[in-house]
Amino acid sequence: MPKQLQVTEQEKIRREKLEELKKLGINPYPAELFPVNNFSSKLIEDFEDKQEVIIAGRIMSRRIQGNASFAEIQDSKGRIQIYFNRDEICKTEDKTKYNVVYKKLLDIGDIIGIKGSMFKTKVGEVTVLVKDFTLLNKALRPLPLPKVDSEGNEYDSFTDLEQRYRQRYVDLIVNSHVKDTFIKRTKIINTIRGFLNDRSYLEVETPILQPIPGGATAKPFITHHNALDIPLYLRISDELFLKKLIVGGFEAVYEFSRDFRNEGMDKNHNPEFTILELYVAYKDYFWMMELTESLIEKVCLEVNNKTEIEFDSKSISFKAPYERISIIEAIKKFTNYDISNMNESELRLICNEMSIEVDDSMGEGKLID
């Protein structure tokens, strides 16, 4: 028999509310257009008193105070405060929409659409006066929102790394900085693509399923092609196919590819990942250095509007050109070890002295890396 879904007490209550909404003739999941015409961040930045707006978002907090209530909704651009007044929403004697639907049947996590007008509270906070609202999506599971005590200490935050990775959709809702990372990643890829396209480099797509896994040393994922009755491998690299295109007559090709490696994993190593590979004919690694400098500077400027960033309490400049130094010189500069004439056993001894984790499979090259 299939395993029965375990439902928490909160989830039971939300399901009961769902049925109550249906009894009132309210569709909790309407497949209809809701004509959003603005976003939270724009309304805050370009505040205009009494401006009529239509917005939508997820309820993230509520403060119910009798016939009037404040709440906060979150859309794709940020959060904004909204103000519910019973008599503004319910113009007739029937106060069900406020007294029952809003106060009793809505929960944090529900998505609502709002029609209203802009104003500022006495303390100057930009707020939407709700004139009408529509339930767009009833959430059946509570959000893992943190609790804050009177002294501002936060508890029960959604910080477990394993859970965050497995439930990215929840992570995006409750940790706003994660959404910023997604947005920056897209900006980075778009900037790189534009940079290479401006130089007339050709973006291509190469096979993901390959008869021979090549281009790197890694353990592949294996599958089977039923029609041909042959084993195939998810690519570990797109290098060989890109080089074949150069052989075929293209002088500059690149690809953003999804590669797969059936090996160990941690927060920095995923079994599937995106990689950029670029091949250009008639160039050398000095030319590639210059291209890389220009590319990284361009990306940093486009994403951060400046070429200098703060990381781990340090200021890092991505303004080209960069210092060029050999790996042997770099090791000597930062560790005071001259490894230019060292053998494998001597390199291994230095790694142990510096508490660098190594194993017996590593040769001179890996130890230097």
Regions found by a protein language model. Give the residues of each.
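Class II aminoacyl-tRNA synthetase catalytic cores and aaRS-like
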Residues: 1-369
